[in-house]
């Protein structure tokens, strides 16, 4: 296992020097979910939430979060993102009263460090935005799990999550 790179010789935090790293195309895909009750599911799918179009607001919030990741996570490098795409899908099992919103975020750039944290941050903020906009109806919503599905580019190469189903969803690409 490799050592932690965010510590200096004194054992204190540092931002990793990426000056010498080669620019490559970097892609990261993250997923999370929000489990809601039937009332929220029906109101969201019919765009009847009083605060507005939940998915539209969550999508914009997620994109903004990806762009602001280095402001939120201390050792993240500020990146010039080339693309952020957020997809939503419902997983519904009426007989189990299960209503889960799957959020999939893809972040891309060309640079010298990866975009995993940007994808994970965007997915998390999307889910938090859904919660915020729906909490008046039910504070018992469940967020997560949140995880990296795939990443490519850079020295460490390609990563694909081995577990093909996390949180009840198959990894969809």
Swiss-Prot record:
Name of the gene: moaC
Enzymatic class: lyase
UniProt subunit comment: Homohexamer; trimer of dimers.
Domain of life from the UniProt record: Bacteria
Stated name of the protein: Cyclic pyranopterin monophosphate synthase
Family: Belongs to the MoaC family.
Annotated active site: 132
Catalysis: reaction(s): (8S)-3',8-cyclo-7,8-dihydroguanosine 5'-triphosphate = cyclic pyranopterin phosphate + diphosphate
Lineage of the organism: Bacteria, Bacillati, Bacillota, Bacilli, Bacillales
InterPro entries hit by this protein: MoaC, MoaC_bact/euk, MoaC_sf, MoCo_biosynth_MoaA/MoaC, Mopterin_CF_biosynth-C_dom
Gene Ontology molecular-function annotations: cyclic pyranopterin monophosphate synthase activity; GTP 3',8'-cyclase activity
Alphabetized UniProt keyword annotations: Lyase, Molybdenum cofactor biosynthesis
